């Protein structure tokens, strides 16, 4: 089909019964907004048995109950006023990905670190797999060295390889220290 250059084309997906469904990216963005609002019940966005697989320090959570108890609630308690600043999203079929940071004030215990009252940026990268309109899997990487540096703890004792950089990044939003 040929369209004039001024027309915008919107992607519409239909389920097997012909009803319009949400895209993978729409589901992920709505979930992110719900987490920012500190919604207690995440079942609208996640399968009960979804897998949350993350880097060292975050762990692996099997199922929604474990995710809410062992990641979402402690994170929400430590950083209650958070705002997600996702910089880029990608979508490929039933997978979506993003990177960005969460801006938050350190109000509660964070992995043994007493509240500092500091406003920090929490860098993250996420990959989600959506099945039947809900998130079935989330693979995430949280930049703990950047978080700890902002909270006054340098785990590299001044010997991190970022010390070898000749210039700061062009995009200031990528600088977290």
List where the protein language model places each region.
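C-terminal and inter-domain tail/linker signature
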Residues: 7, 11-177
